[in-house]
Design a protein with these regions (language model features):
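Short, well-structured alpha-helical segments in soluble
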Residues: 53-63
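Short beta->alpha junction loops
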Residues: 40-51
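Short catalytic helix/loop segments, enriched in acidic residues and glycine
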Residues: 18-36
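Mid-chain, well-packed structural core segment of small domains
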Residues: 64-102
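Short, glycine-/small-residue-rich phosphate/pyrophosphate-handling segment
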Residues: 21-22, 100-146
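Short, structured coil segments at secondary-structure junctions
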Residues: 37, 87, 106-109
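Short acidic active-site motifs
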Residues: 51-55, 76-79
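Short beta-strand segments enriched in small/hydrophobic residues
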Residues: 1-16
């Protein structure tokens, strides 16, 4: 896979829960847009800190080219901050709403933070990742900020 979407848990206490699924129309649009640019896309929804850390580690092992990371409730978790420092590829931090915190500014190879656009934040983050990978131009007529 070329692009991995990692979605963190809603809470990081004894009551952790995975994030709600992306709406099918949003997920379908993401997969279509990535495919249009010659990339593949996979989504990993994580219900715990351990699952997020494992997904980040595997992203390096699998040779992922870019990650869209929604840390959920883990933005202040030191293990997550350390794990993103170890990513061998760029990532875009994604948040559905503006009231979620962000990872520290100098955390790893972060390209941008996209927040406050609901599920649309993922589409905007994907465009940023595709631009960084040099494959934003394709037969799809989608341009963000250009």
């Amino acid at each position: 896979m070329s692009i991995l979407v990692i979605r963190g848990p809603e809470r990081h206490d004894a009551l952790t829960s995975p994030p709600p699924p992306l709406p099918p129309s949003v997920l379908g649009a993401l997969v279509q847009r990535a495919g249009c640019a010659g990339q593949t896309l996979a989504v990993r929804s994580c219900g715990s800190t351990t699952e997020v850390l494992t997904a980040l580690r595997l992203a390096n092992e699998w040779g992922v080219r870019a990650t869209l990371l929604d840390p959920g409730a883990l933005t202040d978790h030191p293990l997550l901050q350390r794990a993103v420092q170890g990513l061998a590829h760029p990532y875009v931090e994604v948040h559905d709403t503006l009231d979620e915190g962000s990872l520290p500014a100098a955390t790893g190879r972060r390209l941008a933070v996209v927040d406050g656009y609901g599920a649309r934040s993922y589409a905007l983050a994907l465009e940023i990742a595709l631009e960084q990978l040099g494959c934003a131009e394709c037969e799809c007529d989608v341009h963000v900020g250009t």
